[in-house]
């Protein structure tokens, strides 16, 4: 006891003090293995029955609080030294929950009793247990490592004179008591923001104070406000950031242009959506005399203005990404940068990072180089305009006559790159998205279906090519950077997906380890089916989520060995860090020393990159969840006016309690509950993804066409209830796979389509996307020398531009 630094504190509390909790933990830390209570009593010099009883109670309390674990061998151990798992608690409206462990496919079940020791969003240390009666693997919470401290949004109510808030997030299945002096004038039914002052425990209720009253009129704006607070998305600019950007001017300073390649006369153009406000990429393409193309991709030079460790950079890092809600945007950067200095607006000088590439007539990336430049966009084009120009719209072709030839070359390049993607087996998703059209009250007036055309796709292929080049550049230099990682699907996910496909009469080829091309063939084979969109969604769900990581493992979906995000530094922090790394390497090639450069280059450590990868991946998921919440609310709000109306749709998911239907053209899902079906007992076949009536034999399967009536909409829970009017059996075995078609068409030949297209490789079958061959060291050295400076063509353009501007300046003087 004499060595216990908290001995005096314990003596004040107890007549016969025992060692403090801190001292016991320190003692066990120094010990090589767990200790029994008797061993601890001897080692801590505990004497007498009273002290032994005190030690027993203290150890039990420490076990209860998660500071110690009582093992099967009747010993006390530190949790971190045992086979415990760290994870995030996912609550459920019915009181129980799950533990999501990183790197583990299946979540662990948390009983309602366990959920009394934690809340949704907590990061905890837990002990995996056996399975419960329903076969669910359980876990026991050992310790809350990082408690959820964010504010909670909910509605304020009073009952019998007691005020309380019911959280809007149903995963928080507890009410929060509000003392009378902490209500901030909130009235019954008002939406409020609460800060917890006392977390719920097994014995006590949660207590909090209202810190903000949002009002009682639930609209689109409030739905966004709730999502921002629920998902802890930063949306207020700190004062230090406001002060920093206040000094920025509207025009690029002349000194910033010095030393850069002048591309202002190169007809670079931006191509974006009609409602886009920030333009971070511009493109130009021309045919090479010897065949193939030269492609310039110019990206806004955000790294020049946003540098670590300034307040602006700290906030951009904290946000991680811009968040695009249907009705508004929460930008990663202040508007003076995102829509101003960094945005490649037409006819104004802008700083940029350029990736200049050469592409062969077969779509091979034959060379690339990076450099800092100054540019002036020659036009702000939209996908719709470019598509109409390519389709022959005479008015638009006359309006943009100087650019038509360049746009046609871009389109020619796209067709070759698209073919190269197909040959290497990259998966192309032809997604149809819902676009909300709002009225003056910011409610959805109608939902329109948007489809991608070749203008969207050509920009996508140009960006992918620049991203590949950037990834290779930093990887070759062994510079720490964030790669965009898309891991292979797990064996369990593949098996589950195949089970569903089999029920629909379809097959995923590729054996135990299907390659990207196998998924691409499947999508091609179902493209004409009425349930193609649903099948594509299922395919996406069977795959792993893409993340950011400095350890490159390739991108499965794109069938690429190296891929990184380079093209959107205005709205994605990983792109900004990649720009800094590239600038650092360019300066290093010129003999620069130090971790920073004059124009914003920066050398990150691997440890910094690991932390950034985790943070940026989290920020991306956070943004997705928030925008999904708002979209779900908007859809429910829209469907309020549709109650009683009849729609057609397709069964998109089947569960034991019913099936979900996705309405045609609206992309809105609702539930047909099993209790609303014909009078029968329905059995859920998980493998076959169907509900089967025991008496009637009526079956409802994934992909079935149905007609439903909208019965009810629950705005609080974001739920829509349908009732079934009629059903129609989904097509089975419609459309052979591309492999089967090739096999049938090439009967009697030695090889089919698969043999012609690709060799068995890891991710990158096509040589178009491989690195330089090691058998040609001279060519490699030549390419390396070229990469250090812009091409002769670019230098010629820059020199002519410089001379022209110098002449103008002389005349002016």
Curated annotation (Swiss-Prot):
Chief site of localization:
cytoplasm
SUPFAM superfamilies cross-referenced by the UniProt entry: Nucleic acid-binding proteins
For this protein, the record's PROSITE patterns field holds: RIBONUCLEASE_II (PS01175), S1 (PS50126)
Spell out the SMART domains in the cross-references.
CSP (SM00357), RNB (SM00955), S1 (SM00316)
Basic and acidic residues: which segments have biased composition?
Answer: 737-749, 761-774
CDD domains named in the record: S1_RNase_R
Q: Where found, per UniProt?
A: Cytoplasm
Which family is this sequence assigned to?
Belongs to the RNR ribonuclease family. RNase R subfamily.
Which HAMAP family did the record assign? RNase_R
Put simply, this protein is called Ribonuclease R
């Amino acid at each position: 006891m004499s060595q216990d630094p908290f001995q005096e504190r314990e003596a004040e509390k107890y007549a016969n003090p025992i060692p403090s909790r801190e001292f016991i933990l320190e003692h066990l830390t120094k010990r090589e293995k767990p200790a029994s209570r008797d061993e601890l009593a001897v080692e801590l010099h505990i004497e007498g029955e009273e002290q032994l009883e005190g030690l027993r109670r203290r150890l039990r309390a420490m076990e209860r609080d998660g500071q110690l674990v009582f093992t099967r061998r009747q010993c006390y151990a530190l949790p971190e030294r045992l086979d415990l798992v760290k994870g995030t608690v996912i609550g459920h409206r019915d009181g129980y929950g799950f533990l999501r462990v990183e790197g583990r496919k299946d979540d662990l079940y948390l009983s309602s009793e366990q959920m009394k020791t934690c809340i949704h969003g907590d990061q905890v240390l837990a002990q995996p247990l056996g399975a419960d009666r329903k076969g669910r693997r359980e876990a026991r919470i050992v310790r809350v490592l990082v408690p959820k401290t964010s504010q909670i949004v909910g509605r304020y109510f009073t009952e019998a004179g007691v005020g309380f808030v019911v959280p809007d997030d149903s995963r928080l299945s507890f009410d929060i008591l509000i003392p009378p002096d902490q209500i901030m004038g909130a009235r019954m039914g008002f939406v409020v923001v609460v800060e917890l002052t006392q977390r719920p425990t097994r014995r006590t209720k949660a207590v909090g104070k209202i810190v903000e009253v949002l009002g009682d009129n639930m609209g689109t704006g409030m739905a966004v406000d709730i999502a921002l607070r629920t998902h802890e998305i930063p949306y207020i600019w700190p004062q230090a950031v406001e002060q920093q950007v206040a000094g920025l001017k509207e025009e690029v300073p002349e000194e910033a242009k010095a030393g850069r390649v002048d591309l202002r006369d190169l007809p670079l153009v931006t191509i974006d959506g009609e409602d886009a406000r920030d333009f971070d990429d511009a493109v130009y393409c021309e045919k090479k005399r010897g065949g193939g193309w030269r492609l310039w991709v110019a990206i806004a030079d955000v790294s020049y203005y946003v540098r670590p460790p300034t307040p602006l950079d700290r906030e951009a890092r904290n946000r991680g990404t811009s968040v695009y809600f249907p009705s508004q945007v929460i930008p990663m950067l202040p508007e003076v940068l995102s829509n101003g200095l960094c945005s490649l607006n037409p006819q104004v000088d802008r700083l940029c990072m350029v990736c200049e590439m050469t592409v062969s007539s077969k779509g091979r990336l034959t060379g690339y180089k990076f450099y800092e430049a100054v540019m002036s966009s020659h036009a702000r084009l939209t996908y719709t305009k470019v598509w109409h120009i390519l389709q022959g719209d005479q008015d638009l072709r006359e309006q943009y006559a100087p650019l038509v030839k360049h746009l046609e070359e871009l389109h020619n390049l796209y067709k070759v790159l698209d073919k190269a993607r197909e040959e290497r087996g990259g998966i192309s998703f032809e997604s149809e998205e819902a676009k909300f059209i709002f009225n003056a009250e910011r409610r959805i007036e109608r939902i329109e279906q948007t489809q991608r055309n070749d203008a969207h796709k050509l920009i996508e292929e140009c960006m992918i090519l620049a991203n590949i080049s950037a990834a290779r550049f930093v990887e070759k230099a062994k510079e720490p950077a964030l790669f965009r990682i898309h891991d292979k699907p797990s064996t369990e996910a593949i098996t589950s997906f195949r089970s569903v496909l089999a029920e629909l009469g379809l097959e995923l080829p590729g054996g135990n380890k299907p390659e990207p091309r196998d998924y691409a063939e499947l999508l091609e084979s179902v493209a004409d089916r009425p349930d193609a969109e649903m099948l594509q969604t299922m395919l996406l769900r069977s795959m792993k989520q893409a993340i950011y990581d400095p350890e490159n493992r390739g991108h499965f979906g794109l069938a690429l060995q190296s891929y990184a995000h380079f093209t959107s530094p205005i709205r994605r922090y990983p792109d900004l860090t990649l720009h800094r790394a590239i600038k650092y390497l360019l300066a290093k090639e010129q003999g620069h020393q130090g971790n920073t450069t004059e124009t914003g280059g920066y050398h990150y450590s691997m440890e910094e990159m690991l932390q950034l990868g985790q943070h940026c991946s989290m920020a991306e998921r956070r943004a997705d969840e928030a925008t999904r919440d708002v979209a779900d609310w908007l859809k429910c709000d829209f469907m309020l006016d549709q109650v009683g109306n009849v729609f057609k749709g397709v069964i998109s998911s089947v569960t034991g309690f019913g099936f979900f239907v996705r309405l045609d053209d609206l992309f809105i899902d609702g539930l047909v509950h099993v209790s609303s079906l014909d009078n029968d007992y329905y059995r859920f076949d998980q493998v076959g993804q169907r509900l089967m009536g025991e008496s009637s034999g009526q079956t409802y399967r994934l992909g079935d066409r149905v007609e439903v009536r909208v019965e009810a909409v629950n705005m609080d829970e974001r739920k829509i209830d349908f009732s079934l009017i009629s059903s129609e059996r989904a097509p089975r075995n419609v459309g052979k796979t591309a492999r089967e078609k090739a096999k049938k068409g090439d009967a009697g030949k030695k090889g089919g389509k698969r043999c012609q297209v690709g060799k068995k490789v890891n991710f990158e079958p096509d040589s178009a996307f491989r690195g330089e061959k090691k058998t040609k060291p001279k060519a490699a050295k030549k390419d390396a020398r070229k990469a250090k400076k812009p091409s002769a063509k670019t230098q010629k353009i820059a020199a002519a531009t410089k001379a022209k501007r110098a002449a103008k300046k002389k005349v002016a003087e």
